[in-house]
Structure formats: structure tokens, C-alpha cells
């Protein structure tokens, strides 16, 4: 059999932390972008996280009840928002980074903190200092770049609204 050529845009998101035994842990999430895929579970494109740790990261799509380690979503665009979930059981910082990026040469990846409105270009690792807890509605990844006509300045001028459902605040 011949080798298949996968030209789908995709990237691997890395997550580093130190566990309670003082061991460095690295989790990796994968995602690819293909026309016709959705945020619903699609066999062959999505895979659940079966070994969720006390401190961990996962794709957190509202349409799917389980947490994903691998996801296939629709086409890459400036409108696409990929929700991230974090489970934090440490007082130590955690680090998020792009481990690998394929067929996305004209795209930058940004982490958005919907609570603070901050936007971070993920071309360098991002250290997060989060209190213990679960974060499922706070962080998303968005995409920009020359192919989309979106630059850093445009992204910085976007307005994000965060709704805190527990405290009924915006």
C-alpha cells in the first residue's frame, strides 16, 4: 500500500505541568480542519480522553458530553473558535504551547481568555497561573494571519463578552 498524503491543516497543542510527585507531565491534543466536519462527535475524526488527570487540558465542545484529546472540525477560518477545557489541581503554573503545526503556514493561533479579554499569540508558549478548579467556558483558540486578512492589531481590537453563569454577571 502506498503512503497517503494528508494535506489537512492540523496542529498539536501541548500542555506541561508538574504533578504532586514533582514529575513533569506533557499532554498533547490534536486537531484537524476539514470541510464538512462539525463540533459534533464524528467517528474517525474525534477521540475521547480516557485518562483525564487531576490537572489536564481537553477540547471542550458543548455538542459533545465527553472531553476530547483528538478532534476534527470544519474548515479553518477567522470565525472558527475552538473551546478549551482545563482541569487544574495544582497551585503551580501550567504551560500551553503549539507542539506541531502542519499545512497552516499562513495562520497564527491565538489563545483568548474570555474572562479578562486578553489575547495571546501562541507562537511562543503561554504560562497560565490558574486557581484550582475546572475551566470550561473561559478559554478558546482563534486563528488569524495574512491568508485571513486578520492581523494582531485587528484581534486586539475585538470585544469579547464573558458570562459568569454562577454569579449571573457579564
For the regions a protein language model found, what residue spans apply to each?
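Compositionally biased Ser/Thr/Gly- and acidic/asparagine-rich
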Residues: 1-170
Amino acid at each position: 500500500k502506498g503512503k497517503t498524503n494528508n494535506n489537512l491543516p492540523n496542529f498539536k497543542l501541548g500542555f506541561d505541568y508538574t504533578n504532586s510527585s514533582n514529575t513533569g507531565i506533557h499532554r498533547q491534543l490534536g486537531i484537524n480542519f476539514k470541510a464538512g466536519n462539525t463540533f459534533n462527535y464524528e467517528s474517525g475524526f474525534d477521540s475521547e480522553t480516557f485518562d483525564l488527570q487531576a490537572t489536564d487540558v481537553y477540547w471542550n465542545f458543548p455538542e459533545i458530553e465527553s472531553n476530547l484529546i483528538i478532534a476534527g472540525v470544519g474548515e479553518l477560518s477567522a470565525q472558527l473558535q475552538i473551546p478549551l477545557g482545563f482541569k487544574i489541581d495544582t497551585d503551580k503554573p501550567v504551560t500551553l504551547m503549539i507542539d506541531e503545526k502542519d499545512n497552516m503556514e499562513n495562520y497564527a493561533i491565538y489563545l483568548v481568555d474570555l474572562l479578562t479579554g486578553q489575547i495571546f499569540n501562541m507562537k511562543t508558549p503561554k504560562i497560565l497561573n490558574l486557581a484550582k478548579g475546572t475551566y470550561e467556558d473561559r478559554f478558546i483558540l482563534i486563528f488569524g494571519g495574512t491568508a485571513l486578512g486578520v492581523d494582531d492589531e485587528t484581534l486586539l481590537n475585538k470585544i469579547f463578552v464573558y458570562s459568569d453563569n454562577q454569579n449571573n454577571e457579564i
